Design a protein with these regions (language model features):
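A transmembrane-helix-recognition feature enriched in membrane-embedded lipid enzymes
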Residues: 143-163
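Hydrophobic membrane-insertion alpha-helices, especially the h-region
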Residues: 1-13
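A structural signal for short, hydrophobic/glycine-enriched beta-strand patches
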Residues: 14-148
């Protein structure tokens, strides 16, 4: 019985946090970089330079935790912000407000691999359009901490914070 429970836990961990998988279209209305350790700013800027979206949103997290606002990209509207609250929930709420204001139909979230599934779920609660993910890697030594963190944050999202 314990072996079955461990196998289910390992399978869920792999599916949700290691290989979350969410194909992306060639263009979306906005790209949102989520703040955090190892924030994949270079991935978000690369997508903007490839003109994958008309808007590039950079979450600076709490006290600029997401890093500095990058240089503007021609023909892409750059919006750097500090979410309130300074969490994935706050990022989703802010992006959801902008989506309603600008009538977006799709958004791509740029985050670290372990956070991608949860970030898409949160964004889906605040935005009625299509939500895609583009994940950046993390150092191998970060995986144990990130998986433990994501399990806790996922339970919180599913049990405590059930709405946008």
């Amino acid at each position: 019985m314990l072996a079955v429970a461990l196998a289910i836990f390992a399978g869920a961990t792999a599916r949700l946090f290691v290989w979350p998988g969410s194909g992306a279209p060639s263009r979306v209305d906005a790209v949102l970089m989520m703040a955090g350790p190892d924030a994949p700013l270079s991935t978000a800027v690369r997508l903007a330079r490839m003109h994958k979206a008309r808007f590039l949103l950079i979450s600076r997290g709490h006290e600029g935790y997401g890093g500095p606002c990058p240089q503007p990209v021609p023909r892409v509207r750059l919006i750097c912000f500090e979410p309130d609250p300074a969490t994935t929930q706050g990022e989703a709420e802010y992006a959801g407000r902008l989506a309603r204001k600008y009538h977006w139909r799709s958004i791509m979230l740029v985050t670290i691999t372990p956070q991608e599934w949860r970030a898409r779920q949160r964004m889906g609660r605040c935005f009625r359009g299509s939500v895609y993910g583009a994940a950046g890697g993390i150092p191998w030594y970060s995986w144990p901490y990130q998986i433990a963190y994501e399990w806790g944050a996922t339970v919180k999202m599913l049990v405590v914070q059930r709405e946008c």
